[in-house]
Amino acid sequence: MRGQWLFAAASCALISSVPPATAQTVQSITDGTTLVTVNASAPGTVLSSVAISGIAAGTTIGGIDYRPASPRTLYAISNVGQVYAINARTGVATAVGTPASPTISGIGFDFNPTVDRIRVVTQTRQDFRVVPDTGALAVFDGTLTYAATDPRATAIPNVAGAAYTNPVAGATSTTLYVIDTNGALAPATLATQGNATVSPNTGTLFTVGSTGVTTIGNVGFDISRNGTALATFTDPTTRQTSLYSVNLTTGAATLIGKLAGSKLYEGLAIALDSFASMGATANQAAVGAQIDMFTGVPTGDTARLINGIDSLYATPGAQAAALSQLSPGAYSSLPDLSLNAVEVSETNVLRYARDLRGQKTMADGTTATLDDAGRVGAWLVGGARFGHFSADVDRPRATSDEVHVLGGLDFRFAPATAIGVFGGYSDTDARLSPGSQQSKLKSLFGGVYGTASVGPAYVDAWGSYTDLDWDLTRSIAFGGFSAQPTAHTGGRVWAAGASTGLSFDFGGFGIEPYAAVRYANVRVDAFGEQGGSAAALNVGQQKRESLRGNFGARIGYEAKVSSALVRIEGRGGYYREFMNDRELITTSFQNAGLGTTPFAFQATRLDRDYYNAGATLGVSGNGPLSIIADYDAQFDHDRRYSTMTVGARFAF
């Protein structure tokens, strides 16, 4: 302990120089049973007033403080020495053990953050410590007395306020300050209990200086994490209680303002910022507001979650990031990831439809018609699609690796017209947020396609249905709290599209400007997470409609190499998403300790404008078999996706 006291003494001047926080929320007791909340910068305006329930009839609350090890739980002591744990939002009090002391008044009540014990001092010079988990008396310490060498050595202390510095969980150093009212006969005195060489457990007081304010025994006193010291003093004549800032170096008190009404106030606790106020976005604030609604006194995983957020206070942005992890933001990319199979289908089907429009050279060197090329055709391709969606606002970075196989069968019933069917399977591994384990999507899909042309003009069209089977995993880790919720859900995608353009041939060189449109209707079913402890969510159904235009051109060249025809094609285009509204995800915590009221999360959409580029290599001989290899990329600042495919087609 001596090293801790030396550290505390050396840092005193620094702590005392910190100005009061103008937006700090503070709480005090009036009428003995009502918890009043005000803003430290405007103490005359009551933010909330809550009746404390659950305390024994005829008793009153005299001292309050937040426990550093569980900083959202307000602890209190009554005039008969009973310790209570209170939910400050609801006012519901839970008795902790049995009374630790007989009748007491003029109470100083504060937590020692280094040992997680409650210090209680009184105007009758009592000085004792209480175990917060049981309410039991830990030990009676020495009678409060000024040090023999102190300027006030002969004074009889009337201590009615106590506060420790550095009130954070796991603190390794702290200093105990007390306020001596001097029986309201002179301005109150600020003192330390103990110093660098004397333990506070001896009850020895050392004068810091006069507050300059005379007060009766209704005193409140607390020190914030950043060293701001606040006190409530009550004028002996007017009985008006006012809020003051206190200089821990000189003892001088500076008036901030009168507390509301003409009632007496007793006790003071500086509350932490609300979780909602920690959010940097509306979605984070919504998550925080739900956590602010926690019920009862947090215990177990609920306490670990809440304490984990609070422990991040010293790192800018860390609390907002924790709220993001607790949101359904990791699931906001599910509709886009669910379109993997559709993207693969569209790319391959439209490419094959183009091949159907006369890519076989006859023996005399002329281009074959559909009918010349064979009335029945089949194709089979396999490949992979991989990439990521970038992080933006409330959307975390999501990566995925997909493999697929699909094939089709078509019938050419006119020289310029063909129809066909296709189907396939897609398997996707996805990380929904950085650090999370892999989620898996299995998709079965099938559809129809067709092509028709008149002269250089053509129209290709397709439609498909995709069944979705998701095994979901996300990871949560912050401030000592961690969880890995999992879930299973399904869904489906209806999609259809068409492409039209003009195809020109210039002696082996081909140019094809085109325009395409695709509509997709995605549904990901509602689900409830498992294994998420206090952070598990119920997530509502997600629906998304997409109407996308694609405008671009293809340039190709084909040449005879030995007995084979080799075709090389390059393409580029611009995508425009016309239905880009931000979807709402309705979600709720499963943990009743956090409240299960649904709240809305507004997903951050991907940019509506992006680009694509690709290339195809095709090789065919005089027989029915042709081989193709294709690469396609979609990109902008929000996404980077590549698709690689190899396959074969057969004409009969």
List the predicted regions and their residue ranges:
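Solvent-exposed, glycine/polar-rich loop segments of beta-barrel outer-membrane systems
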Residues: 392-401, 430-440, 469-490, 521-545, ...
